[in-house]
Amino acid sequence: MAYDLHGSWENKIGHHSQYRPHKDDPVGDIASTNYAVQYWTGKGLPANKLVFGMPAYGRCFSTNVDEPRVGDPATGASPAGTHTKEAGFLSYYEICDKIENKNWKVRYSSTMQAPFAYGEGQWCGSGFKTISY
């Protein structure tokens, strides 16, 4: 599983599907897909037996920080999406809508090798840079 590494159940912002860990990641190096792959292959599991699940959604936080980043305080889950109707969770298309119509900013962390977006007091980690729309 290469997702749900973080979420609104935590009190600090964390990317739920980062490839590499961020230095300010609240749980350290273990919250990355690279760590999971290295762990299992290190235990003897052949790499060709691994199935790598990728998310088409974002785990999202509410925050009071103007330009939020991993490790910043979260005030809770982001509001529920129009279609998904679950706090702290936005579908890929709901994130795209926020980027296109609500002027959310998109950033890419070369450290985590993962994209994220933020705006309107919310922060979402997702795979939208790696999936074209």
Language-model-detected regions and their locations in the chain:
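Non-cysteine beta-strand/loop elements that form the S-adenosyl-L-methionine
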Residues: 1-6
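A Trp-anchored, charged/polar loop motif used as the substrate-binding/catalytic surface
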Residues: 26-41, 132-133
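Glycan-binding loop/region signatures in secreted carbohydrate-active enzymes
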Residues: 8-20, 24, 54-133
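Loop/turn elements at helix/coil->beta-strand transitions in domains of secreted/extracellular proteins
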Residues: 45-51
